[in-house]
């Protein structure tokens, strides 16, 4: 007789393999966390290297640098990138390359000079640091100011005829200087950047408008904004750089200022508009405090168009 176990085995079919359970769905990939942005910094006249992070605009940047070196933020006149020298082509504006080294130029000696305005133009190009100080970016060869040896590129203008201009924007200071009457002497109170020994005696000036040096290293930059958070962006395109340079040149010729960040903002605004009239309306809403004259806006629109054609 067959055993019960044998009969049971013969009468039982091999069970069909069951389908494997469905694999658990992959959770959506978490967005890649951006690494902390830490920048190296020194005082331009000499100091140990500090590290700063967590700023979104120029005022906050100055506060972080001041904290790193135990000084007041108001001691900082301006910053340059990757050079400790008073080099106006390396000024820190609205963008910092992620590998850039920041040098802070602090207040040095105060000096007063008397100037007589014998011509309509003094020969100064003014810019500002975005935190309340206007300073000299360029001195035109052969101009009134060029003949005054005590006045140097990088000097901050603190007062005109004892009237403090601390807190004024560059275009306001340039307008005050333009409106000073001819043939009457006036006094400028200037603060020069503190200098290391190897920087003493430099007096940089230029009558021309060289192309602003590219100070970013790498294709990403930290874009500082006067309102809102800073953002990491791709470095400007060839068109954006060329258009911004042309607009900055026009700012200098019309208003006596240079401001690459302002020029960049105007180029960005132009991308959202299809005509000079629409561009003018957008500028009024974004940059109304500048009160740009109509003929200036038309020239800016044309210059941006030329840059777009040149860069394809």
From Swiss-Prot:
Keyword set, alphabetical order: Deafness, Disease variant, Non-syndromic deafness
Biased segments, Basic and acidic residues type: 1-13
Any one Pfam family match given in the protein's UniProt record, by short name: PDZ
Family: Belongs to the GIPC family.
Record's compositionally biased regions (Pro residues): 18-30
Purpose: Required for postnatal maturation of the hair bundle and long-term survival of hair cells and spiral ganglion.
Name of the molecule in the record: PDZ domain-containing protein GIPC3
Reported tissue expression: Widely expressed in adult and fetal tissues. Highest levels are found in jejunum, lymph node, parietal lobe, fetal spleen and fetal thymus. Expressed in cervical, melanoma, chronic myelogenous and gastric cancer cell lines.
InterPro entries: GH2_GIPC (IPR055349), GIPC1-3_GH1 (IPR056814), GIPC1/2/3 (IPR017379), PDZ (IPR001478), PDZ_sf (IPR036034)
Coiled coil: none
Region feature (Disordered): 1-32
Gene: GIPC3
Species for this entry: Homo sapiens (Human)
Disease entry from the Swiss-Prot or TrEMBL record: Deafness, autosomal recessive, 15: A form of non-syndromic sensorineural hearing loss with prelingual onset. Sensorineural deafness results from damage to the neural receptors of the inner ear, the nerve pathways to the brain, or the area of the brain that receives sound information.
UniProt key word Cytoplasm: no
PDZ domain residues: 112-192
